[in-house]
Amino acid sequence: MLSKSPAPQNTLDRLTAAALAWGEGTYARWAAPVGAIAFSLYILLTAFMALTMPDANWDMLPYLAIAEEGAYPDAQALHDYAYSTVQAGVSAADYKALTDDGGGFRSHMAQHAADFHSLLGMYRIKFLYAEMLSTMSSVMSPVEAMRVLQVVSVLLFGMITLLWLRTEGVLALAPVAGAVLIMADFGDAARASTPDLLCSALFLGGLLAYVRGREAATAVLLFLAFMARPDNIVFLAIFAVLLLVFRQRAWGALAGFAASFVAYFAISHWAQHPGWWPHLWFSSIEQHYNMDGFEPPFSVGAYLKAFAASFIRAISINSWVGVSVLALAAWFALGRAGFRLDRRAGILLAALVLGVLAKFTVFPIHDTRIYFPNLLPPYLLLVGPVMALWASASLNGRRPIAIPGDKP
């Protein structure tokens, strides 16, 4: 049974209550700027960590190779360039970790240029990232260019998030967005030298443009996000189908999908991508040392084994499943309370959720970075219903609260 809190009995209690009331009132008046400043500090700290404490991952080598492939047509020369460039840009301990795993995959690739070159089709398809690295490498060292590109991606992602919150009038909730990013391993994505965060920033910008009805910007940004990571075609296809089924007018998103659909086949052919099944085999079943002509027969058993292994890893060591389930629970709870998204936003949220499920089904890999673009947007879409619920609770809170045992 609930009961009223006892009235302060001494000076200390009264001072504490007064201080809490003052703090609550002050924060309520300054919640928006405080939220924006707190989130900005988090973004700046993340950018600083990306620049000063970057993660030296093996994917740096093939990404640097494809960025300068035109200047080194010979496989051995390209191999030597990539490895020497990374060696000059990372610590001795990091370089040893990238090139010596006791005779395993990394040791083999450090010594066999032809096999290393055969893997590049799986990286060459990230066309936009490679071109940006190549351009930036003309004015700075290639490894430094990777780090600067990560910093730019972090800042761009943070700016778009703040802009989204500002357009909704909910900058006070910016720290909550920061908490979601922490749960979604934003820091790890920022420190990794991969195209994932660049794609996420462009993707988030495209979704904001869609929500605001800026069709041209939607088309351009979603297409650029696809060019950074072509696996975004899965989300774009689902989004386009939902828009057509529910007859939602959004030519920007449809144009972005159409352009990406055409570009997907053109880029795959140009990049000499090995294909879906060989790539899945390499990523989730077994790291094959030479992808030239590698065409393993499709096996339902091998696919299901890869699916199960990735699913177990995803729920045990990664965060994207939990973040996604929490967003779904919030969507359901708000809907049951009568605070629903409008039609346009609801279609987008459904596409984001289905996009994660479809991406994992098509290409079961457990890493959070693969699904990161889809993790924050559902929460940003739900801020409207959350604020409506908050306003409703505030209005109801003005009425006297009946406490069992009280006399009328």
Question: Where are the regions that the model predicts?
Answer:
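Perimembrane helix-loop-helix junctions
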Residues: 14-15, 234-261, 336
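Loop-to-helix entry region of an early transmembrane alpha helix in multi-pass inner-membrane enzymes
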Residues: 115-127, 131, 139-156
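Transmembrane-helix signature of polytopic, membrane-embedded enzymes
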Residues: 144-145, 161-183, 201
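Membrane-interface helix-loop-helix junctions at transmembrane boundaries of multi-pass membrane enzymes
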Residues: 167, 247-254, 329-350
